[in-house]
Each structure stands twice: as C-alpha cells, then as structure tokens.
C-alpha cells in the first residue's frame, strides 16, 4: 500500500510539475523579461522547486513539532526504537516526500532537464537521498529522516529562490545570497553535523542496540555504519 501511494503521487507530482511550469511559470518568466529559452527553462525548474519547498518546508516543521524530535532532539530519534507507528500526518508527509524525490530522480536520470555542469554530483546526491528515504522508512529510522528532510527542504528553498533572483538580475540578489549562505551553513552543516555526531554517539547509547529481525529491532552496528555513511555522503 505504501509503495502504491508513492508510485501514485510520483505520477501526480510529475503532471503537477509540468502543468505549473508550462501554464504558470513560463508565462511569468516571459512577463518578467526572460526571453532566452535556456534561461526560461532554468528559471522554471528553480521556481517550481521553490514552490514545492515553500509548502513542504513549513509542513515538515509542523509535523516535527508534533513529534518527540522537536527541535532536532537527537536523543528522541533513538529512544523507544523501533518507531513502527506514526500519526497519519507524519506518514503522509514522509511518503509524499518520498514521491517528490523519486520523481526528481526520474527527471534527472531520464535527462528531462538539460544536464548541468555538476550533473554527476547531482545524480549521486539523488541516489543517496532516495536510498536514505527508503532505508529509513523500511527500518524505522523515520525520526532521523524527518530531521534530514527539513534541513534539506528549507535550505533548498533558499537556494532555488536565490537562483531565481539571479536569473531576474534582481538588485537584492547579492544580499539575499548572503542570507542563503547563512541558512545553508546552519541547516546543511551545523544541524546535519549535529545529527552525524549523534549517529556516532547516541545511536549506540540511547535505546536498544542490537539486531533482532523478529522484533524489527534494526538499530545495531550495521545500520549505524550505513546511516553514518549515507548522511556523510550528503555532506560531501
């Protein structure tokens, strides 16, 4: 059922993305004076990204606020493990995000967008992200997952909006880029390094630490290595 949910919303997001880009964002780009097709395409991609994260950034904070891991409480990520049941809004948020990242990975791998200079790095980033999403959901590390989602979503919103301003040659591009750098450092590095440190420490000491397939207890040395490696790869 969960797989079907993700598959369905991957398709829904694909159509939503195309509809918004062609019917709303392209006319907006033309109205704002972006005439070159290549620049229009980049603006459309970033504007859609900004719209998505403008919704899911606050949504993620709302869901986190209702959970024990507010505000990036790393010990709560491991207390009472495994976390096998969640309220509906948590599960919906998690799986909708899985749909978004799956859809983005498909766009990238099928080269539906013109490849950027950092194409290989972007592909690797998406592979790591999708692996983290599916493994965290399958093995009940969703409290860690929501924290990583939020750090990525909000920082990506500022990245996308910064790029949009740059395409528009906006006079506030410079100051806004400075704000983006601050947000990016705090979310992608400070908070994620905090989570990485917890993976090395609290992961072992807080809550059970053993492998037991019958009780779905997967917080053990194997998952610790895999989790740390994937999270570290996002920092690279």
Tell me the role of every PLM-derived stretch.
Residues 1-143, 163-184, 190-232, 236:
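Membrane-helix and juxtamembrane interface regions of eukaryotic multi-pass membrane proteins
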Residues 151-162:
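Alpha-helical transmembrane segments and their membrane-interface exit regions
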């Amino acid at each position: 059922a969960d797989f079907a949910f993700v598959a369905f919303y991957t398709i829904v997001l694909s159509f939503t993305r195309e509809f918004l880009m062609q019917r709303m964002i392209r006319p907006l780009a033309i109205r704002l004076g972006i005439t070159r097709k290549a620049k229009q395409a980049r603006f459309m991609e970033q504007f859609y990204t900004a719209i998505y994260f403008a919704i899911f950034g606050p949504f993620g904070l709302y869901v986190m606020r209702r959970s024990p891991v507010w505000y990036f409480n790393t010990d709560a990520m491991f207390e009472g493990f495994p976390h096998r049941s969640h309220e509906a809004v948590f599960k919906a948020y998690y799986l909708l995000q899985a749909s978004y990242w799956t859809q983005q990975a498909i766009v990238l791998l099928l080269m539906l967008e013109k490849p950027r200079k950092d194409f290989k790095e972007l592909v690797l980033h998406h592979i790591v992200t999708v692996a983290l999403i599916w493994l965290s959901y399958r093995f009940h590390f969703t409290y860690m997952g929501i924290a990583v989602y939020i750090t990525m979503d909000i920082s990506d919103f500022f990245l996308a909006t910064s790029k949009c301003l740059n395409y528009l040659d906006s006079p506030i591009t410079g100051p806004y880029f400075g704000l983006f750098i601050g947000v990016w450092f705090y979310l992608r590095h400070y908070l994620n390094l905090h989570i990485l440190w917890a993976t090395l420490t609290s992961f072992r000491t807080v809550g059970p630490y053993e492998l037991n397939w019958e009780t779905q207890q997967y917080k053990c040395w194997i998952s610790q290595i895999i989790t740390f490696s994937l999270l570290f790869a996002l920092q690279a």
